[in-house]
UniProtKB/Swiss-Prot annotation:
NADP(+) binds at residue 46. FMN binds at residues 123-125, 235-236, 275, 290-294, 316. This is Chorismate synthase. The gene is aroC. It comes from Wolinella succinogenes (strain ATCC 29543 / DSM 1740 / CCUG 13145 / JCM 31913 / LMG 7466 / NCTC 11488 / FDC 602W). GO terms for cellular component: cytosol. It comes from the Bacteria. Its EC number is 4.2.3.5. Homotetramer.
Length: 360
């Protein structure tokens, strides 16, 4: 499957070392103003090669809108976007053409499809996430019309974690650190891993502010279920928490429940979701990334002929994928919320009658 969503649908295409990466958005309402400057700004947040803490592969990541927009506004038809690949180095992968890289999708892709793209992993490369960010940027424009904003930051690198949530600082931080006092430590850990030809894991928190009540479907398309599915579909993500998440297992009901008052909920252990439906509180999710599997240390593995071999990778890779992962998580949350907002329409007969002029 290469698509996400029920009514607001994102379909992505392209490979890491192909002509480019792109997406098609279907279901975007007509009349939405498309801010191309914002679109490219979001892509620049994900763009590689901007610091010592990400892959040195340099891409301009300027998006070309192919269809679905006229005179700056969506037309209601499929919105197609394309991002050319400009800095591929496929020769870096020639020596491992038949070798399964440990921790990568090479082994599973090969046995599922009978072939695979050895050049940077093809569709399994994080390069594909540029298309998700492009689609998510349009979703953010739509959500802005509804008063919803989404933001994120890194709260953990390796064993070092922080409870501080300074999202304004994260937007200025080269490693997207939520805690100003932890920024240098995060940098040191990433530099240490890179210097040892290794990588390191990390975690981000993403929030949505201005949430309405009622987004999400009961049982089989819950908001938290949809968010978990979208976020777990992101490269290197190994766990997703909503609200208290794993910590809720250590609490009593009296500690975990959020008291409800006239002005709203007193706390937000639920992370903004009850019964799979948004409750109007801020949406809170945490996303945990494994260490980037592309490392330059010798590793034991197999080749396609079944021989045991030693693999030492070349190429250009992120030492900590969580650093650039935040903007992609924001995009996925935006896509899910945009879809849920459209699905929310028609939940009540009165709403349908009013839309068609029968409720008067």
């Amino acid at each position: 499957m290469n698509r996400l969503g029920e009514l607001w649908v994102l379909t992505t295409f392209g490979e890491s070392h192909g002509a480019g990466i792109g997406c098609v958005l279907d279901g975007v309402p007509a009349g939405l103003r498309v801010d191309e400057e914002f679109l490219n700004l979001e892509l620049s947040r994900r763009r590689p090669g901007q610091s010592l803490y990400s892959t040195p592969r340099k891409e301009s990541d300027r998006v070309e809108i192919l269809s679905g927009v006229m005179e700056g506004f969506t037309t209601g038809t499929p919105l197609a976007m394309f991002i050319p690949n400009e800095n591929q180095k496929s020769s870096d992968y020639e020596s491992i053409r038949s070798i399964f890289r440990p921790g990568h999708a090479d082994f599973t892709y090969h046995y599922k499809y009978g072939l695979r793209d050895h050049r940077g992993g093809g569709r399994s490369s994080a390069r594909e996430t540029a298309a998700r960010v492009a689609g998510g940027a349009v979703a953010k424009m739509f959500l802005k019309e509804l008063g919803i904003s989404i933001f994120s930051g890194v709260f953990q690198v390796g064993e070092h974690t922080s409870d501080v949530r300074d999202f304004a600082h994260a937007r200025k931080s080269v490693v997207n650190a939520l805690d100003p006092l932890m920024e240098e430590l995060f940098k040191e850990e990433i530099e240490k891993a890179r210097g040892a030809h290794d990588s390191i894991g990390g975690a981000i928190e993403v929030r949505a502010k201005g949430m309405p009540i009622g987004l999400g479907e009961p049982l089989y398309h819950k908001l938290d279920g949809a968010l978990g599915g979208a976020l777990m579909g992101l490269n290197a993500v190994k766990a997703v928490e909503i609200g208290e998440g794993l910590s809720a297992a250590r609490l009593k009901g009296s500690e975990n429940n959020d008291p409800l008052r006239l002005e709203g909920f007193k706390s937000n252990h639920a992370g903004g979701i009850l019964g799979g439906i948004s409750n109007g509180s801020e949406l809170v999710a945490r996303v945990y990334f494994k260490p980037t599997p592309s490392i330059f240390l010798p590793q034991e593995t197999l080749n396609e002929e079944g021989d045991e071999v030693i693999c030492a990778l070349k190429g250009r890779h992120d030492p900590c994928v969580a650093i650039r992962g935040g903007v992609v998580c924001e995009a996925l949350v935006a896509l899910v919320l945009a879809d849920m907002a459209l699905l929310r329409l028609g939940n009540r007969l009165q709403d349908v009658k009013e839309f068609y002029g029968k409720g008067r």
